[in-house]
Regions:
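Bacterial N-terminal signal peptides that target proteins for export
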Residues: 1-10
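C-terminal motif of bacterial Sec signal peptides marking the signal peptidase cleavage site
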Residues: 17-21
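Bacterial signal peptide processing site
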Residues: 23-25
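Short, glycine-/small- and polar/acidic-enriched structural segments
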Residues: 28-234, 238-241, 257-263, 274-281, ...
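Pocket-lining segment of extracytoplasmic ligand-binding domains
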Residues: 73, 164, 240, 245-335
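Ligand-binding clefts/hinges and TM-proximal coupling segments of bilobed small-molecule sensing domains
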Residues: 85, 214-231, 236-238, 313-345, ...
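Secondary-structure end/capping motifs
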Residues: 302-380
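C-terminal solvent-exposed extensions
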Residues: 371-398
Length: 398
């Protein structure tokens, strides 16, 4: 066995051990609002009403602030071929599908989905709306474990999460793969509103917080944002971990210049005049890329191709419901505690994410992300983009 393969196995083992530690974190020690146990606060602030001024036109983050119309960032960029329409799709297995399912190892066993909230709640919504049942499946939810550990060990079958969370572990040998597109957007780089930082160029030579740590989701996303603007994330800035709940205080003390936050958590502080956005995954150049994808245990997909297809059909039908009926879906999520904060804010933010992306859109965005990760050195255990795509991208819809 060559040294590269041994190193990849060691990295994968270390990642799994780290994930186990994360999964065993007690609720008392978790950051309040960190619903997905990933170091970020994904939901809005309870009991805080904010004024929402909708816009008919899209503006990128810095432009929207300069124009005094912050909400223009959340008007979706219209992209042909992005939306996958499965709202009226009949999930009932055909006779041929049913016969094939009966021959697969997963037949008669429940689908285990990662119970998640907010923008990653598609698999949970699919169960609540009985879409798995319609697809001829039974389902159980799993909580309290990282998505990488749960999918990689086969304890969970399916989940929605960030490409930035899962891509590097896949290249390090974790047994999972991407099977469909979930949504765009949801993370933005924020500074203090009264600071001197107007663009990412102004951040050179400063410290920037990536709340869930070096090498994790926020680190990878921030690297991509800075790189897109010609800023070297390894040499032009210092990326460091300050948790989401402590970022504002750290900025006020001058310890960091900026912080990557979820838009739902930051929104009330923006409206209160505390924060300002300077770069976002909703900016037009990033709106052509998925932020989050549907992932499954890779061995499960290989051994149960028809089960995998029916599972993804169910999740994508849930995503279509969330996209096409945004207000209804938002109230639905709020009623179940899967969104938090102001209703109008959540309607706008949920609408901006354009849930349920086509395989063609997802494949194109994933290929670009793989190329960027290789160039930036974020992936180190593999160096061939085609081989990475073959490992990480296994679409299951016909």
């Amino acid at each position: 066995m060559n040294a590269k393969k041994i190193l990849a196995m060691i990295l994968a083992l270390c990642l799994m051990l780290m994930a186990t530690a994360c999964g065993s974190t007690t609720p008392q020690s978790q950051i309040k609002g960190d619903l997905n146990i990933n170091g970020q606060i994904e939901v809005g602030q309870e009991g805080v009403d904010v004024e929402v001024n909708l816009s008919d036109v899209h503006m990128d983050a810095a432009e929207a602030f300069a124009a005094g119309h912050w909400e223009a960032l959340f008007t979706p960029v219209q992209i042909e071929g992005r939306a996958l329409d499965m709202l009226n799709f009949d999930l009932t297995p055909t006779a041929e599908e049913k016969a094939a399912m009966e021959k697969e190892p997963a037949y008669g066993k429940p689908v285990v989905y990662m119970m998640s909230d907010g923008c990653t709640s598609g698999p949970t919504v699919a169960d609540d709306l009985k879409y798995y049942t319609e697809a001829g499946l039974t389902a159980d939810g799993l909580k309290g474990m990282s998505v990488v550990e749960a999918l990689g060990t086969g304890k969970a079958t399916v989940a929605v999460n960030h490409i930035a969370t899962m891509l590097v572990p896949i290249t390090n040998g974790v047994d999972m793969t991407f099977v469909g597109g979930a949504h765009i957007g949801c993370k933005t780089l924020y500074v203090l509103n009264d600071s001197q930082y107007k663009t990412t160029e102004d951040l050179k030579g400063t410290n920037i917080s990536v709340p869930n740590g070096i090498g994790n989701t926020d680190y990878n996303i921030t690297c991509m944002m800075l790189d897109a603007d010609g800023i070297n994330p390894q040499t032009d800035v210092t990326l460091m971990q300050v948790t989401a709940d402590a970022c504002v205080s750290a900025m006020e003390r001058g310890e960091i210049s900026a912080c990557l936050l979820s838009d739902s958590f930051a929104y009330a502080m923006v409206k209160d005049g505390k924060l300002r956005a300077i770069r976002s995954l909703l900016d037009e150049d990033f709106a052509h890329n998925n932020c989050c994808v549907i992932a499954m245990n890779r061995t499960y997909v290989e051994q149960n191709p028809v089960h995998a297809k029916k599972i993804i059909q169910a999740v994508q039908k849930a995503h279509s419901f969330m996209r096409e009926n945004t207000a209804e879906a938002t109230q639905y999520l709020l009623d179940r505690g899967w969104n938090a904060g102001d209703f109008d804010m959540n309607v706008m933010l949920n609408g901006s994410m354009q849930f349920g992306t086509t395989d063609a859109f997802t494949q194109a965005s994933l290929k670009q992300i793989v190329d960027n990760y290789l160039r930036l050195g974020l992936i180190q255990s593999m160096n061939n983009a085609d081989e990475i795509m073959a490992l990480a991208w296994r679409p299951v819809l016909d």
